[in-house]
């Protein structure tokens, strides 16, 4: 979450009159994250989150994101619920941006994920994948291989200002991924951005999944690979195999990975690393002046990419060939 677009108090108060969530008492911007403008609202009826959708979110995609949250919640997945305005719509316009309000979830995201957190997110991710099987809407992933090529084109001429040789590394890896990306693995609804700051816990108990603007239909095991990268590496960017085992074991109890998914996991993890390396790189090079946001380090994902390039077997992730934890 972040703040790119400021909202005046009187404008916000008028906007809230179109909802039945009480009168505005206070509000503040939320600085974490890099994608949309988010505000914590305190009204006479409680706490809510207001999101103004920015650069990478198309208004035509909002029914998918907001509808998915409602669908998942109905099937027992803890996630925010969109509020409807007095016209029955789940989004409208504020400060020239598409805007939606969701209920506030209790909990904190883990700054230093432990083994229990990794197990919790494994269980929640698998249950989300299963709950999404009958979601009727479909959204193609705009940040898969073709999207990575477009991102690279935006950053290629300046990539080496971030790290010498980065442009060549990205070009070579994108060529491998374009030639080898799997097309026959199980697909469905994925979150596509389930980082620690998008998962709330009360102690070691997971209390909710948030931030769905990258959700789409894609390879389920790719979502697993995104989480492996986001949850199971340490601050020095080394893989914590104990965390990885806990994550995979918990996921597999709910939805076992097939042999084909396991075989593809190293390549999927490379793709997951490239995806976040590129979006972070573009953001790093293009943060708007004065934005209340700290761009995330793209070089973290260079190190993770190189780790996965060196993987020779899923045993390197703490798994044996059957998908059981080694």
Swiss-Prot record:
One of its GO terms (biological process) is threonine biosynthetic process. InterPro entries: Aminoglycoside_PTrfase, Homoserine_kinase_II, Kinase-like_dom_sf, Pseudomonas-type_ThrB. The keyword Nucleotidyltransferase does not apply. Keywords: Amino-acid biosynthesis, ATP-binding, Kinase, Nucleotide-binding, Threonine biosynthesis, Transferase. Pathway: Amino-acid biosynthesis; L-threonine biosynthesis; L-threonine from L-aspartate: step 4/5. Disulfide bonds: none annotated. One of its GO terms (molecular function) is homoserine kinase activity. Pfam families: APH. Its EC number is 2.7.1.39. It catalyses: L-homoserine + ATP = O-phospho-L-homoserine + ADP + H(+). Belongs to the pseudomonas-type ThrB family. This is Homoserine kinase. It comes from Bradyrhizobium sp. (strain BTAi1 / ATCC BAA-1182). The lineage of its organism: Bacteria, Pseudomonadati, Pseudomonadota, Alphaproteobacteria, Hyphomicrobiales.
